[in-house]
């Protein structure tokens, strides 16, 4: 069995003291809150009861096979603009995402939305697959939702690829595209997705998207993690939850602290769940970045296994830089969020 190691540091809400390290082994407005409770999403007062585990929970083997109760995958097309000339809007592009709808999707209910970005040398099909050829992450969602481990949600797999499907294979280009991606994400993708499907956004204006940020998450592994950090940097007003793994951070702790201060958000307005593997080539830089946030005395990053007491948590495996471990990190984040 693969050994999974957790770096678990628990602090009370924004305690200024440096936490001890322990390791263990094992592979809203009122209306929105009421709607959330009716759909099984916890209210603010319930969040403290939902804690991350002390170590990463392995994905059951059966979750990699087809479930009896299956959600659906849909091809989703939307219009946007070429990344580097985005502000000029001189080159229109039609782009594609894969959208997962949970089993029993009901337009009379509202669903939180989980945006999942691929890494390098990849595309929007990498994790969920396609409607005709679903991949393992789709099966994991189906089983987790059916067994009550994962909250029913909409999952969107877009791409930062720009004018070519090969863009993600160029490392320096991919870095630039993930830094620019927030333009397309906020102005084009979210309004298109959340204007079509039943979410917590009352409409697709920037104000409504910001008002529904508690029910929106961004996640990614490797270059998708870089996109996640950039989303935190550029789009904190529109997302509450961020799940980077094995990539970045894309900027310094001081930069992120300035982002938080400038946004007007407090320490309890967001949550970051981060993960990596000790045999991952990105491990050292990634963990150093998390440690810098954890050790900051600004009071803006608070390490805890739940969002009532903090806004930052980190778990690690002994894994390498591979899709197997990416799905492990995603699964653990999905089992916690909105529960």
Language-model segments: which ranges?
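Bacterial N-terminal signal peptides
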Residues: 2-8
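C-terminal motif of bacterial Sec signal peptides marking the signal peptidase cleavage site
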Residues: 10-13
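Bacterial signal peptide processing site
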Residues: 15-17
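Non-catalytic cap/lid and distal C-terminal segments of serine-dependent acyl enzymes
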Residues: 20-339
